[in-house]
């Protein structure tokens, strides 16, 4: 199947040159890393990032921090496992798909072999295109990856995993099998957990709540992420994808995590009465 983008022209520009200008702005923005990716890294081990998925004007500069780190740590052919929450309520509880996703920068090919093996080994995972057709949380990551590819940083395939079910046990299962399949297939992989943090709360409340779960991520405590999201009523939409990423990365040998940048929508709109939190976090 060839999937068409559903939020191009809304979350990010649909036209090639406008999108390129926007992504370059994200890197060079005062809230971004303030420099463009400029060199090919050397892949030595798997890399995980937490990346936001709002409109680029709000969260793109935050996301650019993570993609700058990816650019410095990849080379050759790389499979990007992209986990995102299912906002639409369509399709299976946990699903991947095969085929190609279109972007304004060109097509992104799914690693069908990895997706198929993961589906066969992970009982909670279905192959279901309906989960992905209208969902934006994975789509908004692809232009950043395709941009790195166009800079000859690496050649990417990806595996989309949409998570409507985000309970702890399911999330851990998904993470376990991602790591298992990556080892069995000897793939160079990066794992991207797509999430925003607190939604539509005052800046002070949102930043305090987000700091709690960010601390858990930085300490690689997957169970505490789930407990604190529930206990503190943190309206983080992709805690399941983050738990799965942390579990997979630990199984693949990760020992450290670093907060690259935290910001809120209020830093753009200057309205701090109702904000959404965004963070870029590196796990390796």
Curated annotation (Swiss-Prot):
A Pfam short name: Memo
Q: List the disulfide bonds.
A: none
Gene3D superfamilies, per this entry? LigB-like (3.40.830.10)
Task: Give the highest taxon in the source lineage.
Answer: Archaea
- What InterPro entries does the entry give? MEMO1_fam (IPR002737)
The entry's family comment says: Belongs to the MEMO1 family.
The name under which this protein is listed is MEMO1 family protein MmarC6_1286
Q: Which species does this protein come from?
A: Methanococcus maripaludis (strain C6 / ATCC BAA-1332)
**Taxonomic classification, please?**
Archaea, Methanobacteriati, Methanobacteriota, Methanomada group, Methanococci
